[in-house]
Every structure is written in C-alpha cells, then in structure tokens.
Amino acid sequence: MDAVQELERRIVELEIQTALQEDVISGLNAMVAELRQTLDLQQAQLRLLYQKMQDRNPDAQEPYSLRDEIPPHY
C-alpha cells in the first residue's frame, strides 16, 4: 500500500506542476500579444516619422541626418 500512496503523491505533484506551468504559459502568451501590439504601433509611428521627414525635403540628395537637428549651442 505504501508504493501506491507514493505513486499517488507523485501524480498529484505532477498535476500541480502542470497546472502552474499552464498558468505561466498563459501569462507569457498574453505578454507576447501585448508586446506585439506595442511593436506594431511603434513601427507605424516610425514609418510616419520617416515619411514626414521625406516630405519635408523630398529633393535632398543626401539622406536625413540627426546632426541637422542639433541645436546651435552644442
């Protein structure tokens, strides 16, 4: 009878571990989905900013440089 109880205890422990892992996986999936939305939004914003910079000076022969934006006191 001792061996049966030990097996039952081990099965219960495995079930608990599985339930905890499923909870962690569910939380990670939610976080990945949220981060994907954030990334999509940031990519859209970056495309918009790039387009605005191109529209600002479409005839420029050289690419846009951040040095052009440095205030004069630097």
Swiss-Prot record:
Pfam families assigned to the protein according to its UniProt record, in alphabetical order: SlyX (PF04102)
Annotated spans, Disordered: 54-74
Family classification: Belongs to the SlyX family.
PANTHER family the UniProt entry points to: PROTEIN SLYX
Name this protein carries in UniProt: Protein SlyX homolog
Lineage: Bacteria, Pseudomonadati, Pseudomonadota, Betaproteobacteria, Neisseriales
